Regions:
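Catalytic Zn2+-binding segment of zinc metalloproteases
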Residues: 111-127
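Metzincin-family zinc-dependent endopeptidase catalytic domain
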Residues: 1-114, 139, 143, 153-156, ...
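Generic structural "secondary-structure junction" signal
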Residues: 38, 54, 66, 119, ...
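Conserved catalytic/binding loops enriched for acidic/polar residues
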Residues: 124-499
Length: 499
């Protein structure tokens, strides 16, 4: 696969793969030979290391290691992400052709490491989301510009798009070809490394100015820029993952059929079900990263650091409101839960609480507020708090009492984190950042507590006295008043947001 990239850089037959000969004088441990080595192991992974001469930077050799159970990992990825799109993925036993294609894609990624390329987790952000559903476009260009991203498969595509394997699998992309030219192209005209550096810098600047698909980010997806993330797709996480949720729902509708075992066991069902729920969590955390971060650019004509637009962050909060804070009960059908032993109430509660903790973390509020002071286009802190409140504090009128149970838990969790910011010494705020209590953020949080109190009073008045919801709102109101008394003292009862 990589030979096309090397041909563009001026080399033919740069990489040749041969079967290991039956020669007793050759050893896999011999540093003269670069090999793909099979490891009989339950580990679900593969890796491509390289040995480099520190004096010159020359890559001396590589042993790509292929654990046996990486095939199990590939099967889970492909069924969960592309089962609704490719009928070959609707069984626990993939045919040799499909598994061979999956192995080829991972092998190409590991070869990329062996020839010097790092992960580029920003590569997939160069593709507009709707292009991932354009059959002609995505089959011609691929769903990511680099196989060195963790872009896996095109989970954005929908069944009605009728996209083939060419538009679902990663491939050597335009970024990869550019990176090989940068690293390997022979430039005999240069004798002075300093002059070469100046010319190459000018060439790269010109190239990047005209083609942002060649952008590289080396943070392994662990920085503050939401464009650089592991296992995401497209230029908008919210739009992409909304499509991903649609496909996960299709997987759940068919999971019992696709994982059926003749012996009546449910080990395969449990394996795939765990992967579906893990995929949903990935979608959630990818969206959450679009809140409170910043863009980091090493592209010409752009600010090195720039703020995330308000609209993008607001879109992320609304996505979380739809797909997490309205409990994803579709992910826990009784016929699956009863066969796998998963505890929906515990898992949904823990996931919702974890994301609330991220949204109301002192560092998050500080980032949003400090950014708003520097840019009128960024998210104002009071707007942010109001939007998060709207996403979480939904009325307790859902036909499902289970959903109402989750909403009550969310109310209590939310109030607990607000208390932690009002009273940093409380159990929920023991580690609250001093930057909160010593800045104007404290005033915004106090104002927000007034909003919570007003909303709780309204819902309490609208509830039937003595029923569960009435007791819930009455308890919340008592807690709000205790928080105020502990912070403001005895005058808390007379204090009001409109006085």
């Amino acid at each position: 696969d990589w030979n096309t990239a090397f041909e563009a850089a001026g080399f033919k037959n740069a990489i040749i793969a041969k079967e290991w000969p039956n020669d007793p004088n050759m050893s896999l441990d011999d540093a003269r030979y670069s090999v793909i080595r099979y490891l009989s192991s339950e580990t679900e992974n593969a890796y491509g290391p390289r040995i480099v001469d520190p004096r010159s930077g020359e890559i001396m050799e590589s042993h790509i290691c292929w654990y046996h159970n990486v095939m199990n990992l590939l099967k889970k990825w492909y069924m969960v992400q592309c089962g609704p799109l490719d009928k070959r993925a609707r069984t626990m036993t993939f045919d040799d052709k499909l598994m061979g294609s999956l192995i080829q894609f991972v092998s190409s990624h590991e070869v990329g490491h062996s020839i010097g390329l790092r992960h580029n987790m920003a590569a997939s952000s160069a593709t507009p989301v709707e292009k991932l559903r354009d059959k002609a476009w995505v089959e011609a260009n691929g769903h990511t510009v680099s196989i060195m991203d963790y872009a896996r498969f095109n989970y954005v595509a929908q069944p009605e798009d009728r996209i083939s394997e060419k538009g679902l699998f990663p491939r050597i992309g335009v970024y990869d070809k550019w990176a090989i030219q940068w690293g390997y192209r022979y430039r005999p005209e240069f004798k002075d490394p300093y002059k070469e550096k100046d010319v190459l810098r000018a060439e790269v600047t010109k190239k990047l100015r005209g083609d942002h698909r060649l952008w590289f980010v080396g943070d392994e997806g662990k920085g503050f820029d939401p464009r650089s993330q592991s296992e995401d797709l497209g230029d908008n996480n919210m739009k992409a993952n909304e499509y991903g949720i649609k496909n996960l729902k299709r997987v759940m509708e068919n999971i019992l059929t696709w994982t059926a075992q003749p012996d009546g066991e449910y080990t395969d069902l449990t394996t795939i079900y765990n992967s579906v729920r893990a995929q949903h969590l990935k979608y959630t955390l990818q969206v959450q990263k679009n809140i409170g971060g910043r863009y980091t650019n090493n592209l010409p004509d752009l600010k090195v650091h720039d703020y995330l637009p308000r609209s993008l962050q607001k879109e992320a909060v609304e996505w979380l409101g739809r797909n997490l804070f309205v409990a994803p009960l579709w992910l826990y059908p009784d016929e699956v839960v009863s066969r796998t032993g998963v505890k929906p109430v515990d898992e949904i509660r823990d996931r919702q609480s974890s994301v609330v903790a991220l949204l109301l973390a002192p560092g998050m509020l500080y980032n949003i507020y400090s950014t708003s002071l520097c840019s009128s286009e960024s998210y104002a802190l009071d707007d942010y708090l109001n939007d998060v409140f709207t996403a979480i504090w939904k009325p307790l009128n859902d036909p499902s009492e289970l959903e109402n149970n989750f909403r009550r838990q969310l109310h209590r969790t939310y109030l607990g984190f607000v208390e932690g910011m009002i009273k940093p010494s409380s159990k929920d705020g023991a580690n609250a950042n001093l930057a909160i209590s010593r800045s104007d953020i404290q005033l915004f949080v106090e104002q927000h507590l007034d909003k919570i109190e007003e909303s709780v009073k309204e819902q309490l008045a609208a509830s039937k006295e003595g029923d569960l919801n009435y007791r819930h709102y009455a308890a919340l109101l008592r807690n709000v008043q205790k928080i105020k008394e502990g912070y403001y003292g005895k005058d808390a009862d007379t204090r009001s947001s409109d006085k």
